Amino acid sequence: MEGLEAYDYHLPPEQIAQEGVEPRDMARLMVVYREGPFRVAHKRVRDLPEFLRPGDVLVFNESKVIPARLLARKPTGGKVEILLVRERSPGLWEALLGPARKAPPGTRLLLLSPKDLAPVPGLQAEVVAVEEDGVRLLRFQGDLVAHLEEVGEVPLPPYIKAKIPMERYQTVYARRPGSVAAPTAGLHFTPELLERLREMGVELRFLTLHVGPGTFRPVKGDPEKHEMHAEPYAIPEEVAEAVNRAKAEGRRVVAVGTTVVRALESAYREGVGVVAGEGETRLFIRPPYTFKVVDALFTNFHLPRSTLLMLVAAFLGRERTLEAYRLAVAEGYRFYSLGDAMLIL
C-alpha cells in the first residue's frame, strides 16, 4: 500500500467548480477504460447511453440531503455551529459542534433562525454526551425535524464559496432524507436522461446510503491507519435480487457514485451475493481491493489524497487514475462536487 503522496495531483483552484452546469446532463464526461492501452473519450453526460447496453443494471443512491447545518447560542451568549450527523432515536442526534471544546455535557443550546439569528421559540438542545471523534449527542426539545427547513442550511463542502440553492445540491430522484452531503455523481442526471436509459433497456435500481461528515474528512498520515465514519445504508430486496441476477447472467452492474460502490460491496457475502437489508459500513476501499459486485463506475473527479480518490484508484488502477486526472486538468475539466464526471468501463 502506497503512502498518501501517491494519491496527490496538481489542480489549479479555478478548476474547482463553484456551480453546477445547466442542464445537468451537459456536464462533460470523460470515459476511461480499465483494460487495454490507456485511452479515453471526451463526451457529455447526456451521451451516457452510447456506453451502456440493454440489461446493464444502473444503481443509484436515493438519499436526500438534509439542511444539517444549524446555528445556536449558549445562554452565556457564545455562538455554536452544529452539524447534524444522524438521528439515533427520536429527538436524539449525533452532531459535530464548533467550537466543540466549549460545549461539554450539560451545555444548553438555543437554536437560531439563519435569517435574523433570533432564537426559534420552543426549539433548544442539550449536550448529553461526548463520544469518540468529538461527536456530541444532542437531545432536542421541540420537533427539530419539522423545523429543519426553517432553521437548517445546506452544509456545503468548504471548497464551494458560492451559496447555491438547496435543489441544485439534490439529485432529481432523492427520496430518503438523511445525508449531510450530496451523493454528487447523481447530480448529473435529469428526468429525461433517466427515461432514455429506461427506454433502451437499462435497469434502473435505487438503494440508500446516507452520506456522513466523514466524506469531508481528510486522510492524515498513513492511509492504513485512517478510520472511516460509520454510514447507514439500506438495500431493498428487489435491488439485491436484480444485482445478483445480473451477476449470474454476466450482465454489468454500473454504480452511480462511490456511495453505491460502498453499499453494494459492504452487503456482499461470499457464495450468496448482495444481501438485502439495512446495515452500517466503515468500508475503506483502496488498492489492492478486489471488487465483488461493481463492474463499471460513474463518478465525479475527487480531491487529492482523499478516500474517494483511493476508491477510484482501486477500481481503475492508481497509475491509470492519475494519468486520467492529469489529462482532465490539461483539458479543463471541472472538479469536485459540482464538477464534471468520469465513466470507468
From Swiss-Prot:
Gene3D superfamilies: QueA-like. It holds the Pfam family Queuosine_synth. Signal peptide: none annotated. Pathway: tRNA modification; tRNA-queuosine biosynthesis. GO terms for biological process: queuosine biosynthetic process; tRNA wobble guanine modification. Keywords: Cytoplasm, Queuosine biosynthesis, S-adenosyl-L-methionine, Transferase. The keyword Thylakoid does not apply. Its EC number is 2.4.99.17. GO terms for cellular component: cytoplasm. It is found in: Cytoplasm. The keyword Lipid biosynthesis does not apply. GO terms for molecular function: S-adenosylmethionine:tRNA ribosyltransferase-isomerase activity. Its main location: cytoplasm. It catalyses: 7-aminomethyl-7-carbaguanosine(34) in tRNA + S-adenosyl-L-methionine = epoxyqueuosine(34) in tRNA + adenine + L-methionine + 2 H(+). It is an enzyme of class 2 (transferase). Belongs to the QueA family. NCBIfam families: PRK00147.1, queA. Monomer. Transfers and isomerizes the ribose moiety from AdoMet to the 7-aminomethyl group of 7-deazaguanine (preQ1-tRNA) to give epoxyqueuosine (oQ-tRNA). This is S-adenosylmethionine:tRNA ribosyltransferase-isomerase. It comes from Thermus thermophilus (strain ATCC BAA-163 / DSM 7039 / HB27). The gene is queA.
